[in-house]
Structures are given as structure tokens and as C-alpha cells.
Design a protein with these regions (language model features):
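Axial heme c-ligation environment in periplasmic c-type cytochrome domains
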Residues: 161-170, 184-223
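Proline/serine/threonine-rich low-complexity linkers at boundaries of modular beta-sandwich domains
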Residues: 21-30
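Gly/Gly-Pro-rich "capping" loops immediately C-terminal to redox-active cysteine motifs
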Residues: 61-63, 140, 149-184
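Electrostatic cytochrome c docking/interface patches
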Residues: 40, 124-144
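Residue-level recognition of secondary-structure-to-loop junctions
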Residues: 84, 94-98
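Beta-strand-rich structural segments
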Residues: 44-58, 92
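Bacterial N-terminal signal peptides
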Residues: 10-22
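Short amphipathic beta-strand segments in non-cytosolic proteins
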Residues: 53-54, 65-80, 157
């Protein structure tokens, strides 16, 4: 065996290790919220617990996410994010001090993966709660807050995203029972989609949105 062959055999595994490490260190991440409120009460903390997954799959501990909420008039509120009980999970209590419409953005702490969440209506203390969203509208909001936007495109949520046609859900319809089973357990078919442990009502809402079983009401469009 020549010296060149020895060097090649010694260095190639090291090179492979470096390439794998570099690939793991880079890329993008998705943020998945456990629960995202339909509205909030001014001055009352909102608990936000979320997971960060590299490339939508690998849970990432040891990050330093940040949460920032803003209004169109320039008000700002921030929350202290701390690790939660589960691997790659984080939690924060965010207080929105004034009624109005607030936009919450979570910076995952992994590269530049930031997630602007759907607008939250903040009501005054003692004010009546807004009417609940219809399932399709709630599903639209979950499409973003559960991290579906990390891989998929839908013209009503993230029209700017460029992706493979198979990941573009705009205008697509699936058998309702199959779609619900897949959302509950993605392993029923070969796919890289993680199991997000969706609740039954979340599955119903996402299925309603993806299949467009109903249209938004005028009040919901205004909200």
C-alpha cells in the first residue's frame, strides 16, 4: 500500500465526519407551539410553550429563543424564554399590556429561523370573549403555529414560499378520514413529517382548513 493510499484511508473518515457535522450545524428549524390562544386579555400573562426542530425533525435543546410582540402603533412586549421539561422544548409567559391586535414573533435561536405567528386580538379585562373561530379559520392559524409552514406552502398562509409541488397544499383535497389519521400519526405512510402529537380538535381544524370544508365568515375575515 502506498503512502498516498494510507493518507487517503486515514483522512476520508475525518472528512466525512466534518461534512456531517457541518450539515448538522447548519440548515433551518421549525417552531411548534403546544397551544396558541385565539385571544388574550390585556395585562394577563399568556403561556407559550414550543418545540424547536432542526429540519422539522430533530429536537434542539440548549438554544436561547426570544419572543417579541408588537402592534402597528409601535408598542412592544418581550418575554423571558426558559427551557421546558421536554427535550428541545421552551416556555415563556408573555404579557400584552394593551388591548388591540398584536403580532408575536418567536426567534428560535437556531440560525435565523424566526416565526411570525397569526395576529392575536387582545381584549380589555372584563370584556366579553370574542366568538370562537370556525374550524377552517382555526386550522389556518394552526398551519403557522404548529410549524407546517416550515415544509409546506398554502397560498392563504405563506404564498411567498417556494417548494416542491407535492408540498404545496393549495387547492388540494384529501379523503377526510385518511387526512385525520395521517395528521394523528404520520408514520402510516413513508414520510419525514414528525408526529406533533396534535389534539383531536386541532386535527379537525387542520383537516377542515386543508380540505376547505367551509369558508370564513365575514366577521372572521375582519378579525
Amino acid at each position: 500500500m502506498t503512502t498516498n493510499h494510507v493518507i487517503r484511508l486515514v483522512t476520508t473518515p475525518a472528512l466525512v465526519f466534518i461534512l456531517i457535522s457541518a450539515a448538522f450545524a447548519g440548515g433551518w428549524a421549525i417552531v411548534t407551539l403546544d397551544d396558541f390562544p385565539e385571544y388574550a386579555v390585556a395585562g394577563k400573562p399568556v403561556n407559550l410553550t414550543f418545540a424547536v426542530r432542526q429540519h422539522g425533525v430533530t429536537l434542539l435543546p440548549g438554544l436561547h429563543p426570544t419572543i417579541r410582540a408588537t402592534t402597528a402603533t409601535g408598542l412592544t412586549s418581550k418575554a423571558n424564554v426558559v427551557p421546558a421539561a421536554g427535550r428541545g422544548e421552551y416556555t415563556a409567559a408573555l404579557t400584552l399590556p394593551q388591548q388591540g391586535e398584536w403580532t408575536i414573533t418567536i426567534a428560535s435561536g437556531f440560525n435565523d429561523s424566526n416565526v411570525p405567528l397569526p395576529a392575536v386580538k387582545v381584549i380589555a379585562p372584563g370584556a366579553p370573549a370574542p366568538a370562537p373561530f370556525s374550524p377552517p379559520t382555526r386550522g389556518l392559524r394552526l398551519f403557522r403555529s404548529k410549524g407546517c409552514i416550515g415544509c409546506h406552502r398554502h397560498i392563504e398562509v405563506n404564498p411567498e414560499r417556494v417548494t416542491d409541488a407535492k408540498l404545496d397544499l393549495t387547492g388540494k383535497r384529501f379523503p377526510q378520514d385518511y387526512l385525520k389519521r395521517f395528521l394523528a400519526d404520520p408514520s402510516i405512510k413513508p414520510a419525514e413529517m414528525p408526529n406533533l402529537k396534535l389534539k383531536n380538535d386541532e386535527i379537525e381544524a387542520l383537516a377542515a382548513f386543508i380540505n376547505k370544508l367551509a369558508s370564513k365568515t365575514r366577521e372572521e375575515v375582519q378579525r
